[in-house]
Regions:
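Peripheral interaction segments used for macromolecular assembly
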Residues: 1-197
Length: 197
């Protein structure tokens, strides 16, 4: 299921052992190499003073409308407990507010949100707010991860806009691959006697 990052922020973390919420999600920890979420920074009275304030996504048993379910508070980790998470934290990387441009250098705007899959926590799309002039026609762009060519500390570079728009237009011009039995040869619409006086 695709979920907006903005909807995940503030999601309760539910502990089976405690029988209720122990924290809420503050922000995501994203690996810029593959746009996979490794964990979440948490906040709340039970975790604010503890060193272990990070939820590794591998500890999540279930994600539902109620929140993210884990076994117990012991599942939370400190920043230096998991080497991969520690390495990403040192990069201080965040997708939100990164500028987006094409390979040719056309500025498209900056990232205001993104979608991810709730099964594997991989970013699937970025939502880009357009510059003021372009926003009059199209205020936001939704760009698939397949269009991303490179990610730096300051910007996301995507395939040239013409290719992205062409691919989107082809997708919208999709014709279903089925035969309409009422359009077969030899079929004639029924005649009606609707004579107008």
């Amino acid at each position: 299921m695709l979920v907006m990052n903005s909807r995940i922020i503030g999601t309760p973390i539910l502990s089976v052992q405690a029988g209720g919420p122990i924290a809420t999600i503050k922000s995501a920890i994203i690996d810029p190499n593959d746009l996979k979420i490794l964990g979440f920074h948490l906040e709340g009275p039970l975790v604010n003073r503890a060193e272990a304030r990070i939820l590794d996504v591998r500890s999540i048993r279930e994600y539902s409308q109620l929140g993210m379910v884990i076994d117990n508070i012991e599942e939370l980790v400190a920043p230096d407990d998991v080497i991969k998470i520690q390495n990403v934290l040192e990069l201080n990387f965040d997708l939100i507010n990164l500028k987006v441009r094409t390979k040719k250098g056309t500025k498209l705007g900056h990232i205001i949100d993104y979608t991810l899959t709730s099964e594997d926590f991989i970013v699937q799309q970025i939502i880009v707010r357009r510059p003021l002039v372009k926003s009059l026609v199209d205020p936001e762009l939704t760009i698939s991860r397949k269009e991303i060519v490179e990610i730096t500390d300051y910007e996301v570079i995507i395939k040239d806009e013409e290719k992205v728009l062409k691919a989107r237009a082809e997708k919208e011009d999709f014709v279903p691959n089925f035969v309409n039995p009422f359009r077969e040869q030899g079929f004639a619409p029924a005649k009606t006697d609707d004579k107008k006086d």
